[in-house]
């Protein structure tokens, strides 16, 4: 271990560190697999490549707390060879992120319709990151939720809770017929905030 550590110290890139250690490069997400580490090989062809990705989901624009316009984001996605973009700005409960109230949702949808006409066959999907409230309800009425192509449901408030409370909120959100995706399931913020406890098996 010490001899390998000495070889990789000061390497400018991960690839160079592996090269210095006399090992084939192994992507970070595969390094916890003991079989791959001990065999020093893996099937690179089996990995998802950039060209396999057809679209980008869960994007915030400058309509809420994002930095760029929807048009800028769509054009950038097109340049990357993407076929679609899912705009999922923050919902109205996320006041700290300029979340969208109902009238802004309708305004944004009209704007997306215009962009889709200009950019077709590229497609911008209408989405929202809807807050899961303390009782597990989403923060829009069904009449608004029904207007989205897909809804990402996320917990952003009251994060310090028991597993029982967390599961109640998450399962209520899942049972909402308009929920498509759960966002950041445990609320964990890497290196700065622990997640709340959940029963992954039950959720799956």
Language model features with spans:
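Acidic (Asp/Glu)-rich catalytic clusters
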Residues: 78-79, 140-148, 172-178
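Short, electropositive alpha-helical surface patch
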Residues: 106-109, 138-150, 203-204
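Distinct, well-ordered alpha-helical segments
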Residues: 134-144, 170-171, 193-197
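Short, charged, surface-exposed secondary-structure boundary motifs
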Residues: 161-163
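C-terminal, non-catalytic macromolecule-binding modules
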Residues: 165-189
């Amino acid at each position: 271990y010490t001899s390998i550590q000495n070889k990789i110290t000061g390497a400018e890139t991960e690839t160079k560190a592996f090269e210095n250690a006399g090992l084939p490069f192994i992507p970070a997400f595969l390094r916890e697999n003991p079989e791959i580490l001990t065999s020093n090989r893996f099937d690179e062809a089996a990995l998802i490549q950039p060209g396999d990705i057809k679209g980008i989901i869960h994007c915030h624009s400058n309509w809420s707390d994002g930095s760029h316009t929807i048009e800028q984001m769509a054009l950038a996605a097109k340049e990357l060879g993407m076929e679609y973009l899912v705009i999922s700005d923050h919902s109205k409960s996320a006041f700290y992120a300029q979340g969208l109230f109902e009238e802004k949702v309708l305004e944004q949808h009209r704007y997306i319709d215009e962009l889709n006409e200009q950019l077709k066959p590229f497609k911008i999907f209408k989405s929202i990151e809807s807050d899961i409230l303390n009782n597990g309800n989403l923060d829009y009425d069904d009449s608004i939720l029904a207007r989205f192509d897909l809804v990402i449901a996320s917990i952003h408030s009251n994060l310090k809770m028991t597993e029982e409370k967390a599961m109640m909120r998450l399962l209520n959100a899942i049972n909402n017929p308009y929920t498509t995706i759960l966002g950041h399931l445990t609320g964990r913020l890497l290196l700065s905030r622990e997640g709340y406890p959940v029963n992954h098996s039950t959720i799956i």
